[in-house]
């Protein structure tokens, strides 16, 4: 998506450790109008007819998934990274290694909110090595729900998480794939 690539070039920064910082519009300060454009793009890519849930991970995926949820009129569920006292009943759990936080976390989702009757569209802000996405896909599989698609705003192509998911046959589409990010700037994959 050309508009997203331009926004990354304009407002994105590259930090040590291949961290791509786009917190001025995507996942800290949020440009909801622009996220609406991303949601519109996902609606062109995926057949959202019949989708019953949008699933994402706490916390940075929430803004984009919430905008998609609002625009499509579909409930959003986010997998939590810590069990709180207000979660009751059965849980789906998947242990992942967080690239950003450099530690193992457990994604948790109440069995009340995703069931075998659901058709799930997974939406997230970033895809790097694929660990968080693997955890979300585990939750979909554990629930018995049908996976409709996986939409990511930005994929770090150089970390190959997306390539592995595509090779495994998952219906993944990223709006911008960055194949290189260094002192020379960003190099985007042609799609």
What residue ranges belong to the model's regions?
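Active-site-facing substrate-recognition patch
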Residues: 1-51
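PRPP-dependent phosphoribosyltransferase catalytic core
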Residues: 2, 7, 18, 137-191
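Short glycine-rich phosphate-binding loop at a beta-alpha junction
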Residues: 51-58
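Conserved acidic residues
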Residues: 52, 118, 148
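Short Gly/Thr/Asp-enriched flexible loops that form oxyanion-binding sites at enzyme active sites
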Residues: 63-72
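Short, glycine/charge-rich flexible loops or terminal/linker lids adjacent to PRPP-binding catalytic cores
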Residues: 74-120, 186-189
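Active-site/ligand-binding-proximal alpha/beta "capping" segment
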Residues: 116, 124-142
């Amino acid at each position: 998506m050309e508009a997203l690539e331009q926004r990354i070039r304009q407002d994105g920064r590259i930090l040590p450790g291949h961290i791509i910082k786009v917190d001025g519009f995507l996942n800290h300060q949020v440009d909801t109008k622009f996220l609406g454009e991303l949601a519109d793009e996902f609606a062109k890519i995926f057949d959202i007819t019949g989708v019953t849930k949008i699933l994402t991970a706490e916390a940075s995926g929430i803004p984009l998934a919430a905008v998609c949820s609002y625009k499509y009129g579909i409930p959003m569920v986010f997998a939590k990274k810590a069990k709180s006292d207000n979660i009751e009943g059965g849980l789906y759990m998947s242990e992942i290694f967080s690239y950003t936080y450099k530690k193992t976390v457990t994604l948790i989702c109440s069995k009340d909110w995703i069931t075998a009757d659901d058709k799930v569209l997974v939406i997230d802000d970033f895809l790097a090595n694929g660990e968080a996405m693997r955890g979300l896909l585990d939750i979909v599989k554990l629930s018995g729900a049908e996976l409709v698609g996986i939409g990511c705003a930005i994929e770090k192509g150089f970390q190959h998480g997306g390539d592995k998911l595509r090779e495994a046959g998952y219906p993944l589409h990223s709006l911008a794939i960055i194949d290189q990010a260094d002192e020379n700037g960003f190099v985007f994959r042609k799609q």
